[in-house]
């Protein structure tokens, strides 16, 4: 399964990368990063020992061009909400591990889940 991740530079991002690299059923095809510096992204790939190197991008349309089959999100509540509409447009299933949503934000995710497969599992790193 082709996987894309948001929040790649965080603790859970690192853990997910390790798990993906240890299981032949999964491949990391893209990662959404806030870094716009290609040099910093190159260092991130090297530091995380990403082999093969996935697409690192701050542009969601570029992430979608990598054709992921699922997007695992460990970002921030507002960033997660910004993923809903473009994910719905291409029917990209979401696994959301982000924490700190307000009740209103949870309702927005719930509405999106009526048309898009979404697993909302904050704190699943515990």
Identify what each model region corresponds to.
Residues 83-88, 97-121:
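Rossmann-fold NAD(P)-binding glycine/threonine-rich loop
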